[in-house]
UniProtKB/Swiss-Prot annotation:
Species, as recorded: Nocardia farcinica (strain IFM 10152)
Coarse class of the protein's main subcellular location: cytoplasm
Function: Cleaves peptides in various proteins in a process that requires ATP hydrolysis. Has a chymotrypsin-like activity. Plays a major role in the degradation of misfolded proteins.
SUPFAM superfamilies registered for this protein in UniProt: ClpP/crotonase
Active-site residues annotated for this sequence: S100 (nucleophile), H125
Entry protein name: ATP-dependent Clp protease proteolytic subunit 2
One of the record's GO molecular function terms: ATP-dependent peptidase activity
InterPro entries assigned to the protein according to its UniProt record, in alphabetical order: ClpP, ClpP/crotonase-like_dom_sf, ClpP/TepA, ClpP_His_AS
NCBIfam families in alphabetical order: PRK00277.1 (NF001368), PRK12553.1 (NF009205)
Amino acid sequence: MTKNQAGVMTSATAGLNLSDSVYERLLRERIIFLGTQVDDDIANKLCAQILLLSAEDPTRDISLYINSPGGSVTAGMAIYDTMQFAECDIRTVGMGLAASMGQFLLTAGTKGKRYALPHARIMMHQPSAGIGGSAADIAIMAEQFAHTKRELNELQALHTGKSVEQVTADADRDRWFTAQEALEYGFIDHVISHANQANGIGG
């Protein structure tokens, strides 16, 4: 490598750490990654990435890889709505752990294009609520929590083909699934061990 080449590389990567560089390269391949707890910051980032990629080419799939313990329901619903809003198909791939809101987003991928790696673990449960304050506040929050729980169960039923009643019963406590069990339940459509099994993951 010449001194000039080294200078160009240094300039091009200034301000970027290795992690940033990897995620930018993945984004260019229409691959986005949810690898943390779901919060407002990560939701805003993922929503922006989905909107950008959908606007760039609405005919090519986006691949969303998920390794997440879950998190905020409102942040997760922002990602969910953006996934449904996008014109292009959203492939979802569960790896490691897809729990709670992570499981919900995995299941929200385009039907037929929802995958899990063989040793992924998937967990479904009802949303949690920290309710406190005055009696009036508690009543309002309890009503909102009941609405959120009902809405999530209805959407889970829509994406899995299960009845709302079954989803409600199954989600009452933490329920864990292997990749194969998640396939049988309807959370995903395929268990894959190699990228080429997903028929061109990454668009």
